Swiss-Prot record:
Its EC number is 3.1.3.16. PROSITE patterns: PPM_1, PPM_2. It comes from Bos taurus (Bovine). CDD domains: PP2Cc. This is Integrin-linked kinase-associated serine/threonine phosphatase 2C. It comes from the Eukaryota.
């Protein structure tokens, strides 16, 4: 049985993009980012529990907590054209004493991952990390998460990439968290740092979005019918006030006060935060999958320092206005398109600080092109 064979085919647009050959907008995507895509939640453990002819796969406790959210009804065969991806970033310390955010841009790690050449043409990785209690957890995650991912990435022929990428991501997050907690607990006094993590792993034209905490990933997609760009949420925030998160925390013996774990921690999933792991805080990410289409313009990854003062729609429209600003021209030998994306990141980060965001601000924009 195909991993997603039980899912209905996506609806097709009556007016496909000329020469694209790729999948179009799937009908279960929200019209705009609502900030809570809970209605789209679908656990991969439910989808793969029957494998082969009636064989059952047992889901581990961690997999039950880490659900894969489908941003489309079925992963279609990718277009013969692989969309190019290129990341740009800007960061501001804001009013904080220390810059505790971290980020990683790896436009092409295909050679490092050594994927099955017959199945995968390109692998890319983009991530933002929002540290709290210090910079050590976010810095550690930025330095090690992708390295662990590369080591665990599916290799060799005769494997199903679709079936193994989620396990690869789950193992990567678990291993990275365990490594940091081991190092943190060996210190005197023990480190209490923690970090969110929002990662986009692109395997050809398929995005896998793994998220812990309240940093976010947003996709800008053009709607041909409305002739407008939509901001589509690719990640799910993890706050202790959410029902499932609160129930897990309480079941583990913790509690939620004033919207925080034990009245202190603002997020319910993170890397690090060793003192809260026994209280139900977990490093198991939510994993979503999204097929890129010819109508996709860019991906925005940002920490909550941006979204405290910008809605996703406002941020996407702000970036679009920068990309259409003809005053931004080629400079320092860089093409105009690069100059505009860099300006969009810098202007958006500056505007967030001007609007009063007291937090660190990290803005990453990933350009999607042919």
């Amino acid at each position: 049985m195909d991993l997603f064979g039980d899912l209905p085919e996506p609806e097709r647009s009556p007016r496909p993009a000329a020469g694209s050959g790729g999948p179009l907008l799937f009908d279960d995507l929200p019209p705009a980012s609502s900030g809570d895509s809970g209605s789209l939640d679908t656990s991969l453990s439910e989808e793969v529990k029957n494998e082969g002819k009636g064989a059952k796969r047992k889901a581990s406790d961690e997999e039950k907590n880490g659900s894969e959210e489908l941003v489309e009804k079925k992963v279609c065969k990718a277009s013969s054209v692989i969309f190019s991806l290129k990341g740009y970033v800007a960061e501001r310390k804001g009013e904080r004493e220390e810059m505790q955010d971290a980020h990683v841009i790896l436009n092409d790690i295909t050679a490092e991952c050594q994927p099955p050449s017959a199945l995968v043409t390109r692998v890319s990785y983009f991530a933002v990390f929002d540290g709290h209690g210090g910079i050590r957890a976010s810095k550690f995650a930025a330095q090690n998460l992708h390295q662990n991912l590369i080591r665990k990435f599916p290799k060799g022929d005769g494997i199903s990439v679709e079936k193994t990428v989620k396990r690869c991501l789950l193992d990567t997050f678990k291993h990275t968290d365990e490594e940091f907690l081991k190092q943190a607990s060996s210190q005197k006094p023990a480190w209490k740092d923690g970090s969110t993590a929002t990662c986009v792993l692109a395997v050809d034209n398929t995005l896998y979005i793994a998220n812990l905490g309240d940093s976010r990933a947003i996709l800008c997609r053009y709607n041909e019918e409305s002739q407008k760009h939509a901001a589509l949420s690719l990640s799910k925030e993890h706050n202790p006030t959410q029902y499932e998160e609160r129930m897990r925390i309480q079941k583990a013996g913790g509690n939620v006060r004033d919207g925080r774990v034990l009245g202190v921690l603002e997020v319910s999933r993170s890397i690090g935060d060793g003192q809260y792991k026994r209280c139900g805080v977990t490093s198991v990410p939510d994993i979503r999958r999204c097929q890129l289409t010819p109508n996709d313009r860019f991906i925005l990854l940002a920490c909550d320092g941006l979204f405290k003062v910008f809605t996703p729609e406002e941020a996407v429209n702000f970036i679009l206005s920068c990309l259409e600003d003809e005053k931004i021209q080629r400079r320092e030998g860089k093409p105009t398109v690069d100059a505009r994306y860099e300006a969009a990141c810098n202007r958006l980060a500056n505007k967030a600080v001007q609007r009063g965001s007291a937090d660190n601000v990290t803005v990453m924009v990933v350009r999607i092109g042919l």
